[in-house]
């Protein structure tokens, strides 16, 4: 069968001289604090966004944290409701091809406290700790779990859900819908009485330099970077590129585009903004005020449709639908 030609862009390129990097001072401080506390940590729980199972995971950093596999390690892919159940098997295959040593992977949805993945975290961690050698630990009766991962993947939410499920207590870790809410390594938070289990929340940490532009755009699209670092217009353009390259055209109906799929983000946003009456006043150089379509508001709406799952289930790391 002949390969289907791609009528859209076959690659996404950033504007000239633009690079995606976000490594504020609190990340450097957080890395230092994490390494200082590792001595008394029994198990590493890595939280990541299920929609980007590969993008943004710094294997070198995690090797350092886990002592190249000496400390037990659980990978928790959160926000699985936005990935979808049908894609879980292929995600597991992707991960194990890239990182064969990964043995313990859970899918979680912190919006559902009865989610099996959430409920499996503590029993699995407890078993792994009991089976491992616990070096430099003076209080063997306690289990200390450290939560790590990139920003805005639900690390604090996981802690709060586990605390509520096992202790029936309210939230203890700050959460938010944007990257960078947790800015330092926190104190131990108790999440279980018997045996005593504590969790240590940590700030989201990215690679100091993101050399792969598309990986950076994936991180931006799911919200691991603050939107203003990259720009909503560029994030919306990458979303359009990704949807087209994977033959996912539900956005046409969602945005009510009259001309069908398009590769022109400016035209897409302009048509949507006009239809939804998204306008703003712009003062011109001569003092006149003109009413214009608000492309930024339209871009934010488009991104919201993706992040809320209204465009369907997505694995941003799946291969393109075109060859």
From Swiss-Prot:
InterPro entries on file: G_CP_dom, GTP-bd, GTP-bd_ortho_bundle_sf, GTPase_MTG1, P-loop_NTPase
Membrane protein topology class: Peripheral membrane protein
Classification via SUPFAM superfamilies: P-loop containing nucleoside triphosphate hydrolases (SSF52540)
Modified residues (Phosphoserine): 308, 320
Domain CP-type G: 31-208
GO MF entries: GTP binding; GTPase activity
Residues given in the record as GTP binding sites: 78-81, 152-157, 204
GO terms under cellular component: mitochondrial inner membrane; mitochondrial matrix; mitochondrion
Keyword check for Transport: no
Described purpose of this protein according to its UniProt entry: Plays a role in the regulation of the mitochondrial ribosome assembly and of translational activity. Displays mitochondrial GTPase activity.
Family: Belongs to the TRAFAC class YlqF/YawG GTPase family. MTG1 subfamily.
Protein name: Mitochondrial ribosome-associated GTPase 1
């Amino acid at each position: 069968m002949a390969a289907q030609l791609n009528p859209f862009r076959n690659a996404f390129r950033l504007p000239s001289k633009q690079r995606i990097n976000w490594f504020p001072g609190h990340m450097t401080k957080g890395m230092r604090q994490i390494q200082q506390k590792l001595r008394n940590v029994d198990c590493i729980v890595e939280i990541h966004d299920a929609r980007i199972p590969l993008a943004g995971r710094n294997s070198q950093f995690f090797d350092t944290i886990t002592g190249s596999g000496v400390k037990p390690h659980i990978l928790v892919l959160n926000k699985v409701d936005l990935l979808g159940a049908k894609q879980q098997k292929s995600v597991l295959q992707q991960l194990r091809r890239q990182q064969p040593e990964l043995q313990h992977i859970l899918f979680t949805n912190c919006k559902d406290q009865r989610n099996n993945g959430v409920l499996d975290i503590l029993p699995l961690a407890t078993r792994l700790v009991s089976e491992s050698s616990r070096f430099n630990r003076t209080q063997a009766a306690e289990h200390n779990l450290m939560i790590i991962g990139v920003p805005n993947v639900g690390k604090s939410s996981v802690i709060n859900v586990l605390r509520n499920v096992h202790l029936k207590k309210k939230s203890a870790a700050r959460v938010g819908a944007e990257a960078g809410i947790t800015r330092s390594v926190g104190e131990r938070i108790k999440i279980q009485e018997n045996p005593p289990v504590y969790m240590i929340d940590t700030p989201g940490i990215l690679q100091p330099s993101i050399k792969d532009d598309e990986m950076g755009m994936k991180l931006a699209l799911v919200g691991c970077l603050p939107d203003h670092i990259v720009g909503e217009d560029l994030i919306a353009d990458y979303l359009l590129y990704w949807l087209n390259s994977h033959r996912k055209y539900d956005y046409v109906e969602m945005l009510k585009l009259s001309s069908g799929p398009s590769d022109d983000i400016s035209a897409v946003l302009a048509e949507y903004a006009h239809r939804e009456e998204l306008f703003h006043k712009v003062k011109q150089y001569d003092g006149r005020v003109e009413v214009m379509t608000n492309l930024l508001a339209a871009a934010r709406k488009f991104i919201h449709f993706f992040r809320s799952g209204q465009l369907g289930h997505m694995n941003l790391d799946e291969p393109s639908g075109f060859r």
